[in-house]
């Protein structure tokens, strides 16, 4: 048996179409969703990411403004800009590109963004809302995992799910998202005594450890669903996930590849957060 591959690019296209339609509807009402992105310094990867978001925003009809600050910007100056954007009713989402220069505290900066404009979903209040089952903004990568499962017709209620990785932006949020869908969830991490045994018991495996090839084919239970949220540089310089995909595909029923799986949807979901944040700011949001 060979697994069916989940087409993340096709799902991303569906998401973009849905977002584009919602943006068009908002614009007809005179509401223009807007994302502000702050870039401090000239880190090449950050510049590329910022410009790719600008292009994606234009394709969706979402207004976009990039604030480029020099690398020697003070923490106080950056916090002052964030405060100004927090107070600007025309801005519905704020994102700060990472990494930041060493003179600036990442924690202070991310916590300074208004929770309802925190499209990365990393503010402590948004984490708390997720834990409490209340409407809030959730990081894009765990949302992408959930979208791949939902749009592939995978039932979660009562299923044994193993998450590999307990990071703040993927593993932990996924735990609460899956609980919300009535899954039975185990989180494995670096101190887990027998990872292979835990994974073999899972009907759904979500790998988010950031370690290339951590999950081998022999760990996967027959007919399990495998979602690979890992992004690593392989020995040949190409991007690979946490799962040995070809091996796992021999046993799984459904598997997401890297690239072309989870990562394909994250930018679209970032912009969906802009729209959800807009609704939260207007008191219109429902879970």
Swiss-Prot record:
The keyword Iron does not apply. Transmembrane segments: none annotated. Pathway: One-carbon metabolism; tetrahydrofolate interconversion. One of its GO terms (molecular function) is methenyltetrahydrofolate cyclohydrolase activity. NADP(+) binds at residues 165-167, 190, 231. GO terms for cellular component: cytosol. The keyword NADP applies. It catalyses: (6R)-5,10-methylene-5,6,7,8-tetrahydrofolate + NADP(+) = (6R)-5,10-methenyltetrahydrofolate + NADPH; (6R)-5,10-methenyltetrahydrofolate + H2O = (6R)-10-formyltetrahydrofolate + H(+). It holds the Pfam family THF_DHG_CYH. It comes from the Bacteria. Keywords: Amino-acid biosynthesis, Histidine biosynthesis, Hydrolase, Methionine biosynthesis, Multifunctional enzyme, NADP, One-carbon metabolism, Oxidoreductase, Purine biosynthesis. InterPro entries: Aminoacid_DH-like_N_sf, NAD(P)-bd_dom_sf, THF_DH/CycHdrlase, THF_DH/CycHdrlase_cat_dom, THF_DH/CycHdrlase_NAD-bd_dom. Belongs to the tetrahydrofolate dehydrogenase/cyclohydrolase family. Catalyzes the oxidation of 5,10-methylenetetrahydrofolate to 5,10-methenyltetrahydrofolate and then the hydrolysis of 5,10-methenyltetrahydrofolate to 10-formyltetrahydrofolate. HAMAP family: THF_DHG_CYH. This is Bifunctional protein FolD. It comes from Heliobacterium modesticaldum (strain ATCC 51547 / Ice1).
């Amino acid at each position: 048996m060979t697994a069916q591959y989940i087409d993340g690019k096709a799902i991303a296209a569906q998401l973009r179409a849905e977002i584009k339609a919602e943006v068009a509807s908002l614009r007809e009402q005179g509401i223009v969703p807007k994302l502000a992105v702050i870039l401090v310094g000239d880190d090449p990867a950050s510049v590329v990411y910022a410009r790719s978001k600008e292009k994606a925003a234009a394709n969706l009809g979402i207004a976009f403004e990039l604030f480029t600050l020099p690398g020697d910007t003070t923490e106080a100056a950056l916090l002052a800009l964030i405060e100004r954007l927090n107070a600007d009713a025309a801005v519905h989402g704020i994102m700060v590109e990472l990494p930041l220069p060493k003179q600036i505290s990442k924690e202070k900066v991310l916590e300074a963004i208004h929770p309802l404009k925190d499209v990365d979903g990393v503010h402590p209040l948004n984490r708390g809302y997720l834990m409490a089952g209340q409407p809030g903004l959730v990081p894009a990568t765990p949302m992408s995992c959930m979208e791949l499962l939902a749009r592939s017709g995978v039932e979660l209620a009562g299923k044994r799910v193993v998450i590999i990785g307990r990071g703040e932006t993927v593993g932990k949020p996924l735990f609460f998202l899956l609980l919300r869908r009535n899954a039975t969830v185990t989180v494995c991490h670096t101190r887990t005594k027998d990872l292979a045994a835990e994974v073999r018991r899972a009907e759904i495996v979500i790998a988010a450890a950031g370690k290339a090839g951590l999950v081998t084919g022999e760990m996967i239970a027959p007919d399990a669903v495998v979602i690979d949220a890992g992004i690593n540089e392989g020995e040949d310089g190409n991007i690979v996930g946490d799962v040995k995909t070809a091996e796992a595909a021999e046993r799984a029923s459904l598997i997401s590849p890297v690239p072309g799986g989870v990562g394909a949807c994250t930018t679209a979901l970032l912009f969906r957060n802009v729209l959800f944040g807009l609704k939260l700011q207007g008191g219109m949001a429902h879970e």
